[in-house]
Amino acid sequence: MIAMNTPDFQRMKKDNKKISMVTCYDYWSACIISQSNVDCILVGDSLAMVMYGHSTTLPATVEIMAQHIQAVSRGAPNKFIIGDMPFCSYRKDLTTSMNAVERLMQAGAQAIKLEGADAHNLKFIHHVVKSGIPVIGHLGLTPQSIYTLGGFKVQGKEPSAAKKLMADAKALAETGCFAVVLECVPSELAELITNSISIPTIGIGAGPATSGQVLVLQDLLGTNNQFQPKYLKKFLNGFELIKKALDDFDQEVKTSTYPHLETHCY
């Protein structure tokens, strides 16, 4: 049984209880998260970068997302799972875009997430919500628009940009989103937005005042020693621990210490 549902997001904001979300892409990681206290899982299109080595999220496709959502849902059937709508999948005609939503939901997502709040997106979100499908918005640094934004950089610094982010957040809430991700926006702006809309905000690089926080599993475990944005706290030195385990394995194989005849052999 799933431990969390969409009304719980609203309740947790009302009760001032923080929401924890982890981005996860695979079965074995999801199995670990399923045994943790983390509230919910995002299967993000960032898998194009983290799992496949691309420089942007753009190569993620609906089918790739569906395969990873299936894997995560098998590993964490007790967690609320959000599936990212990948690049351009919701910028097509309504039938094609809804087919993409259907694919992700049938793969095991309980909600979808999409980036931006222009007129096209708001109309599409309205249709999806009216179809009974929960939607999370995403504002600030929206990686699918990376070439328009000019890189992975903080958004909303200028007054006009901050005003637009506030208006977009209100529009997403009014259109029916049950939460919104705020990525790489100034802390004060994120706090203002959080206090100005009824739905929860989930921050990543948006300060401590948001309704919750999301980090990519591999990032919080410290598995990439080359990746250290300002917002990231590594809760484990995963790179060094995993590397040491591999080196220990290598040494024991080469010294015939492993496998031990009495302990590891049949």
UniProtKB/Swiss-Prot annotation:
Q: Which GO terms label this protein's molecular function in UniProt? A: 3-methyl-2-oxobutanoate hydroxymethyltransferase activity; magnesium ion binding
**Reaction it catalyzes:** 3-methyl-2-oxobutanoate + (6R)-5,10-methylene-5,6,7,8-tetrahydrofolate + H2O = 2-dehydropantoate + (6S)-5,6,7,8-tetrahydrofolate
Q: Which Gene3D superfamilies match?
A: Phosphoenolpyruvate-binding domains
What is its subcellular localisation? Cytoplasm
Where is the catalytic site?
E183 (proton acceptor)
Going by the UniProt record, its keywords in alphabetical order are: Cytoplasm, Magnesium, Metal-binding, Pantothenate biosynthesis, Transferase
GO biological process terms, semicolon-separated: pantothenate biosynthetic process
Task: Name the major location.
Answer: cytoplasm
Q: Which domain of life is it from?
A: Bacteria
Cite the cofactor comment: Binds 1 Mg(2+) ion per subunit.
| GO annotations of cellular component type | cytoplasm
- InterPro entries found in the cross-reference section: Pantoate_hydroxy_MeTrfase, Pyrv/PenolPyrv_kinase-like_dom, Pyrv_kinase-like_dom_sf
Q: Which residues bind 3-methyl-2-oxobutanoate?
A: D45, S46, D84, K113
Pathway(s) annotated for this protein in UniProt: Cofactor biosynthesis; (R)-pantothenate biosynthesis; (R)-pantoate from 3-methyl-2-oxobutanoate: step 1/2
Database matches in PANTHER family: 3-METHYL-2-OXOBUTANOATE HYDROXYMETHYLTRANSFERASE
Describe the task this protein carries out: Catalyzes the reversible reaction in which hydroxymethyl group from 5,10-methylenetetrahydrofolate is transferred onto alpha-ketoisovalerate to form ketopantoate.
| Family indicated by similarity | Belongs to the PanB family.
Subunit arrangement?
Answer: Homodecamer; pentamer of dimers.
**Protein name, as recorded:** 3-methyl-2-oxobutanoate hydroxymethyltransferase
